[in-house]
Design a protein with these regions (language model features):
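Rossmann-fold NAD(P)-binding glycine/threonine-rich loop
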Residues: 81-87, 91, 100-138
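N-terminal glycine-/serine-/threonine-rich beta1-alpha1-beta2 phosphate-ribose binding loop
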Residues: 1-90
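Catalytic, metal-anchored helix/loop core of enzyme active sites in primary metabolism
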Residues: 146-150, 158-161, 165, 177, ...
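Substrate-binding/catalytic subdomain of NAD(P)-dependent oxidoreductase enzymes
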Residues: 175-271, 276-278
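A conserved regulatory-domain signal marking ACT and ACT-like small-molecule sensing domains
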Residues: 309-407
Length: 407
């Protein structure tokens, strides 16, 4: 029998315990032996919960327990998670985690520690919740050079943008609703400012390339400035606005960005709505591959964690190699990226001379009820060229356009 410890008995931790109990028979067959939760580390007690007899409050009771083979870190945050995970690996225990902040900050180091000790550090649930994406990149798609990854990787922001698009509600209204439903945290900054999705694309890009991407160097913009007026133009253009986390390789350089994008009905992520996530991957041989499903939530995320636990038990004493080392991947500057932009400017449609002087003979777009402003879509240009031209017009807002198409 394999024995594990769970660090954190919150949403995901309790889900892990629930799945191991509910699916015990099938999990035992897949792992080759039964899996038992021996200890659960938490600051709290849980009187009346069957798990109470396994609750411990001291990490040393986990680290020093030679019976524990696998440690499951589902506490979140970088510390003390990083310290606890390092200690677990040093003590000869494999580790599974759903913690994208930990993986984005220390993934390469922890993978190296695990490899040196013939252990495993697994993190399928850190990106996409229940959507399998880490394993496909590391196993099924290893014959390919990955040329592009773009995804809706945050359910909170996708829910907010979907409701704004469909119902015409304001950002502030939908955020309050999302918080009431449990889709958004009391402090939603990590989600709505794009930081959560940024960390996830950093992890995927690091795995796809094999070198470490510093998530702090990825251009990141959130959704807090997206307005109902922006969606009015989007509807006029048969498009929607999505927070996309994207990286791609072009001319030997790797670019990465997390920001709101305007996408039309031909885009592979157009119909990914609500709290669902979708991730598009292009490989130079396989072509286009799509991953779609629940990107968060208790049981979907816990399911991915339990999948990692099973892998750790099956491969005890053997490292399942993930190619991601600590060599830094230098990202190309965002200013050099080439794309089109949707732009809203103040003014009357009878006076578009300055816009056309700066951006060429663009088509002017108007929306009924929105007075003293108009919109247009630029030709493809670098971000640097756009910023220089936009400085000469009375711009209200701009949204990048992603024109990814399934091949």
């Amino acid at each position: 029998m394999a024995k594990i410890a769970v660090l954190g008995y919150g949403t995901v931790g309790s889900g892990v315990v629930e799945i191991l109990d509910a699916n015990a028979e099938s999990i035992s067959k897949k792992a080759g032996q039964p899996i038992e939760v021996k200890s659960v580390l938490d600051l709290r007690d849980f009187p009346g919960d069957p798990i109470q007899e396994k609750i411990v409050h001291d990490i040393d009771l986990v680290i020093n327990d030679d019976e524990i083979d696998v440690v499951v870190e589902v506490m979140g945050g970088v510390e003390p998670a990083f310290t606890f995970v390092k200690r677990a690996l040093e003590a000869g225990k494999s580790v599974c985690t759903s913690n994208k902040a930990l993986v984005a900050a220390h993934g390469a180091e922890l993978l190296a520690m695990a490899k040196e000790r013939s252990l495993n550090f697994m993190f399928e649930a850190s990106v996409g919740g229940g959507i399998p994406i880490i394993r496909p990149l590391n196993q099924a798609l290893t014959a390919d050079e990955i040329t592009k990854i773009t995804g809706i990787m945050n359910g909170t922001t996708n829910y907010i943008l979907t409701k704004m698009s469909n119902d015409g509600s304001s950002y502030e209204e939908v955020l309050k609703e999302a918080q009431a439903l449990g889709y958004a945290e009391r402090n939603p900054e990590a989600d709505v400012e794009g930081y959560d999705a940024c960390r996830k694309i950093a992890i995927l890009t690091s795995l796809a390339d094999g070198r470490t991407v510093n998530f702090e160097e990825i251009t990141t913009e959130g959704i807090t400035k997206i307005s109902n007026e922006d969606f009015a133009y989007a509807r006029k253009l048969n498009s929607v606005i999505k927070l996309l986390a994207t990286s791609y390789r072009k001319d030997g350089k790797v670019y990465a960005i997390t920001a709101p994008f305007l996408i039309d009905t031909t885009h592979p992520l157009y119909n990914v709505n609500g709290v669902l996530n979708g991730i598009y991957v292009n490989g130079n041989m396989v072509g286009d591959v799509m991953f779609f499903g629940a990107g968060a939530g208790k049981l979907p995320t816990a399911s991915a964690v339990v999948g990692d636990i099973i892998d750790c038990v099956k491969h005890k004493g053997t490292n399942v190699c993930l190619i991601w080392d600590d060599e830094k991947l230098e990202l190309a500057p965002t200013r050099d990226e080439v794309r089109s932009f949707f732009v809203r400017v103040k003014g009357n449609t009878s006076d578009t001379a300055m816009v056309k002087e700066q951006f060429g003979d663009v088509e002017i777009i108007t929306v009924d009820g929105l007075d003293n402003e108009f919109g247009f879509i630029t030709d493809k240009m670098t971000e640097e060229a756009f910023d220089k031209a936009a400085a000469n017009v009375d711009m209200i807002s701009r949204i990048r356009i992603d024109d990814t198409k399934l091949q």
